[in-house]
Amino acid sequence: MMGVLATLFVAFTVNQQVVHAEKVTYSVAPIYPENQTDKNLGYYDLGVKPGQKEEVSVVVQNTGKKDLEVDVAPNTAITNQNGVIDYSQSDPKYDKTLKYPFTKLMSPAQRLKVPAESSRTATFTLNAPKATFEGTILGGFYVSQVKQDQVEQALDHKKGTSLTNRYSYILGVKLTQSDQTVKPHLRLNRIKPGLLNGHTAILSNIQNTKANSIGEMQVDAKIRRAGQSKVLYHSKQTDLQMAPNSNFDYGIDLKNQPLKAGRYNIKIKVNSNKGQWLLSKDF
């Protein structure tokens, strides 16, 4: 899945809550340690030994005319509710199968003050698991600018919230102990009613129980009355992803129609770059 990982891990900009257009005046880059497998990847791909301790550094370059502050946070990769691998959450709810969250292997987040037209380096200590592990530990450094200028904030007095221009970068980190791959395994867990984009929906929790990510997922879900062949609701999505040892709720829109009382069955077919699965559950 290196093509997918390369796409995910190359430092990129995320515009969260745009109030007005603004030029990005900083960039980030990795400093590769000796155990980097390939220095042309654009992300950290580190082969580690049990109990290994090392430093991992991130360079922040300020290309602007003003000083700035950035937060650099080592976050664990999860799967968000859009079916995308997400590195931006500092305190997510971890899947029960995740044995080694990346965040817990790294020293805490740092705040850097970077003078105008200068660079600064954030250095973190990585403590690899003392025991051997299979597959991949996935995380990333989430770098976001700290905004001090209140002029750049738009305050919504009715809701009591503020919107601020914030541009963020992600530098991915992949930890492995061997070249042996672990095949992902998908499981269908709870089925429950909920909301999807403000509409009533059925939410089906899909779990990846193994230490390997999945990309290029095509998900085709159908709901029927239990024991019947007529499809009542159908949902299909492409280009979804799942982080190692993670889960998310896949939603099937009910078009704001109530689901009548009774027994139903859901079948979810998943095709991906790591395999195929057919999941089924009565509810």
Q: Could you tell me what each predicted segment is?
A:
Residues A21-D38, L175-H185:
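Proline/serine/threonine-rich low-complexity linkers at boundaries of modular beta-sandwich domains
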Residues D91-T132, R224-K260:
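Intrinsically disordered, low-complexity Pro/Gly/Ser/Thr-rich segments with frequent PxxP/GP/PP motifs
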Residues V24, P30-Q36, L41, N75-S119:
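A surface-exposed loop-and-adjacent beta-strand signature within N-terminal beta-sandwich domains
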Residues D179-F283:
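Membrane-proximal extracellular "stem/stalk" segments
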